[in-house]
Amino acid sequence: MSVIIRTMTIADYDGVSSLWLSIKGFAIRSIDDSREGVDVFLKRNPTTSVVAEDNGVIIGSILCGHDGRRGTLYHVCVAQGYRNHGIGKAMVVKAMEALEAEHVSNVTLIAFT
């Protein structure tokens, strides 16, 4: 396993969308989570969303954005076979560092169980 944690771009959308669809019960909204919706989100927040990649395959993702004051982590997920290896934590750390670089210190996590 050779996992890379990096900033998400719209080029990652197909892999991220496939990951979302692979997770049972994952809440996807057709407008917000469409390619167009995610593109708008990433353009507004170009440095804060994160993916985890193993040999070119997206195995984790976080949509992360802020309004200048508060940050929010959305769609935090790791593929089933990659869980319990610290990948989720590493992605959260990278997203939090990106928020800190933009002087955002209040963060909310949106989670569905």
Model-derived features: positions:
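Acetyl-CoA-dependent GNAT
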Residues: V3, T7-H75, A79, V92-K94, ...
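Conserved GNAT acetyl-CoA-binding A-motif
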Residues: L99-A111
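Residues forming the Rossmann-fold NAD(P)(H) cofactor-binding site
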Residues: H85, K89, V93
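Glycine-rich beta-to-alpha transition loops that act as phosphate-gripper elements at the mouths
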Residues: D32, F112-T113
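A short, internal acetyl-CoA/4′-phosphopantetheine-binding micro-motif in the GNAT/acyltransferase core
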Residues: V76-R83, A111-F112
